[in-house]
Regions:
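Thiotemplate assembly-line natural product biosynthesis machinery
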Residues: 159-183, 202-209, 230-233
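Anion (oxyanion) recognition and catalysis
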Residues: 51, 55-59, 108-113, 138, ...
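Von Willebrand factor
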Residues: 42-44, 49-70
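Short acidic, Gly/Ser-rich segments with clustered Asp/Glu that frequently serve as metal-coordination loops
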Residues: 32-42
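Active-site-adjacent betaalpha module
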Residues: 1-26, 68-161
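Phosphopantetheine-attachment site and its flanking helix in carrier
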Residues: 188-211, 227
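AMP-binding/adenylate-forming catalytic domain of the ANL superfamily
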Residues: 212-230
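Phosphopantetheine carrier-protein modules
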Residues: 174-193, 210-218
């Protein structure tokens, strides 16, 4: 069922390159329940990519909608309302490349041209079909993008006031330690929750890009949520 995800060089270049903005994005994940029930799902890079996308979206308060066939009508009604109330909405789609995925995509394309597929967060019947389908959507001028680039664009386009708010700081930290925000005590060392050097560097880069003056060394002097919030308020 699973196959090695294609490398960038194997995929047709994206012919549509409108700017992705976190404030306009809506993430659709199609058929995740089917994928999660497949043997060996937890060891797949695809599982990691979908989880990373979902966590980054939640950290930046981007709506995430899970779509499965049993709730299709209800979810599409909800999505239709969101798209009609926001003419700048951008729909980012990932998940199981099934007939349901293609049906959802056609419905969305009938409402907006701002549709992008996450090209390393979908599962086709085979690697060859995956590559061919990305080539087809490129030919149809539908944007495709990989997980890392999308997450970077989301973070870079998020409003500074949101990123540096107490809620924004909490959500970013929660994403990096893989916990629900309510689980993080403000005075407990974040290393106890699993914060590592990679997570620290990401957070420092994110906050500096939004105007904060902060170094990894300063953050690690007292790596608690409370201390970080105080540092970022200066």
């Amino acid at each position: 069922m699973f196959y090695p995800l294609p490398r960038k060089i194997q995929l047709a270049p994206s012919t549509s390159n409108w700017s992705i903005e976190s404030t306009h994005s809506i993430l659709l994940i199609v058929g995740l329940n089917e994928l999660e029930n497949a043997p060996d799902w937890m060891n797949q890079p695809l599982a990691d990519h979908l989880e990373m996308l979902s966590k980054r979206a939640q950290a930046l308060e981007i709506p995430v909608m899970m779509i499965q066939s049993s709730q299709l009508q209800q979810v599409m009604l909800q999505l239709g309302q969101q798209l009609s109330s926001n003419t700048q909405a951008q729909v980012i789609i990932a998940g199981n490349l099934s007939p349901l995925f293609k049906q959802v995509m056609q419905l969305v394309l009938s409402i907006t041209d701002y549709v992008a597929v996450v090209n390393d967060a979908i599962l086709a019947g085979s690697l060859e079909q995956h590559i061919q389908w990305i080539e087809k959507i490129s030919f149809d001028s539908i944007q495709h993008i990989n997980t890392q680039t999308l997450m970077r664009l989301w973070s870079l386009s998020a409003p500074s006031a949101q990123v540096l708010s107490d809620k924004g700081i909490l959500l970013a930290v929660a994403e990096q330690v893989g916990r629900h925000p309510m689980e993080i005590h403000p005075e407990i060392d974040l290393r106890n929750y699993g914060l590592d050097a990679v997570g620290v560097n990401y957070l420092v880069e994110l906050w500096r890009a939004n105007g904060a003056s902060l170094s990894a060394e300063e953050l690690m002097q007292t790596p608690t949520l409370q201390h970080i919030m105080q540092l970022l308020k200066h």
